[in-house]
Regions:
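Short acidic-glycine-tyrosine-enriched beta hairpin
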Residues: 92-109
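Conserved short histidine dyad/triad with adjacent acidic residue
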Residues: 57-73, 108-109
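A short, N-terminal "cap"/entry segment at the start of jelly-roll beta-barrel domains
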Residues: 2, 7-59
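Short beta-strand segments in beta-sandwich/barrel cores
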Residues: 68-69, 85-89, 103
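Ligand-binding loop in jelly-roll beta-barrel domains
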Residues: 108-128
């Protein structure tokens, strides 16, 4: 990449489209050292390891086989599937089968929230 391309990349990266992360100095997270907290779904269990600082929450979540969420979620997320298979259902009836390497990005949406379920189990990385 030439100097002009680098400058253009950084200019575009720093304009309004970038996520605004505040009050979080550089920090490395060893997820294996984060406290594991279990959350019961309508059926099954999910296991969360959570980094919650500044204005963001970052989670490594494992949905155990047979998990079905106990609520519709209207909070915005970026979710990346690392392992397994997770189904995201929108209240409008659409379903999306998420496999390793796929992600979804969604804004806060009271009108069309989502929920998650899995037959096989899944491990995901979530930022919200």
């Amino acid at each position: 990449m030439c100097r002009w391309e680098q400058e253009e990349f950084w200019r575009l990266s720093n304009e309004g489209a970038a996520m605004k992360i505040q009050n979080i100095p550089f920090e490395v997270t060893d997820w294996s050292q984060m406290t594991l907290v279990e959350h019961e779904g309508e059926r099954g269990t999910s296991q969360w390891r959570t980094f919650d600082r500044g204005n963001i929450r970052v989670r490594m979540v494992e949905y155990l086989p047979g998990f079905y969420s106990d609520h519709w979620c209207s909070r915005g997320h970026v979710l990346l599937v690392l392992d397994g298979e997770l189904v995201i259902q929108l209240r409008d009836g659409r379903e999306f089968v998420m496999k390793p390497g796929t992600s979804f990005q969604a804004e806060d949406d009271e009108a069309n929230p989502h929920l998650a379920f899995t037959d096989k189990g899944a491990k995901v990385f979530i930022v919200d």
